[in-house]
Amino acid sequence: RQRQMCIRDSANTMLNKGAIKEIIRQSSDPRVGCVAGEKRVEIQAEQGATAGEGIYWKYESALKRLDYRLYSAVGAAGELFAIRTSLFEQMPPDTLLDDFILSLRIAMKGYKIAYSKEAYALESASLNMREEEKRKVRISAGGLQSVWRLRGLLNMFRYGILSFQYISHRVLRWTLTPIILFALLPLNLLLACTGHTLYTVILALQLAFYLLGYLGYKMEKRNIRNKLLFIPYYFLFMNINVIRGYSYLAKHKGTGSWEKAKRGAG
């Protein structure tokens, strides 16, 4: 039986040769309702300030590969993905992450989201960290919106391993993790006051991590690229913007439009 697929990509990306063939190959499995391609970020020499974006997407891609190896990828990115035409659902107009929600609703119907690193979309990094900040805030807001709209997927008794993957990979990242991360400092300070060596060492390591993040921030301001310092900076930068996503979601409630982040020249 012939199955029709709808393939979607972003206007500012370039697909690799053979990407479409790979997506069609993956979709031949009747258990697959969606095929997620890999997003790759191209970093130009003059875009050292946004090197963390490329590192983040390498990490995210590795997680998606492991998710699919376990059972199913947890959502698809709009840069490149495909769905069975028969499974398409119209999203509400105020949806911020329509590609993510659509793909997971397909998974909730019992289909898998296949992940293929052989089909990828190449995109230039954000022009600078200010543009990357805008992107991260709106994606975080979309993630929070998704947690509510996909709340049925939190039921592990119904969705089993898919629910576990969704909660561990997405829900915790968009809800508890940023709050817990910044609550750790005062908690570790209190524990260190007990005089226990272990707590003192943990506090020192945490402060060192924050210091590296601050140094990464200062170097970013000077457009100096240093991965050792930029990784802790980008990690903290991401979690701060998740918290900012709460206010963004409240401010833009009822609208799914947003200002696109400016990208560097590819």
Where are these regions (language model features)?
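Catalytic donor/gating beta->alpha subdomain of glycosyltransferases that bind UDP-sugars
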Residues: S27-Y59, D94-D98, S103-H169, Y234, ...
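Conserved nucleotide-sugar donor-binding
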Residues: A77-Q90
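Membrane-embedded multi-pass helical conduit in multi-pass membrane proteins
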Residues: E123, R173-G254
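Membrane-proximal intrinsically disordered regions of secretory-pathway and membrane-system proteins
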Residues: S257-G266
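Loop-to-transmembrane-helix entry motif
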Residues: L66, L70, R170, W174-P178
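The conserved acidic donor/metal-binding loop of glycosyltransferases
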Residues: R8-M14, P92-D94, I106
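Short, small-residue-biased leader/transition segments that mark boundaries at the very start
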Residues: Q2-I7
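Acidic donor-binding/catalytic loop of UDP-sugar-dependent glycosyltransferases
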Residues: D9-Q26
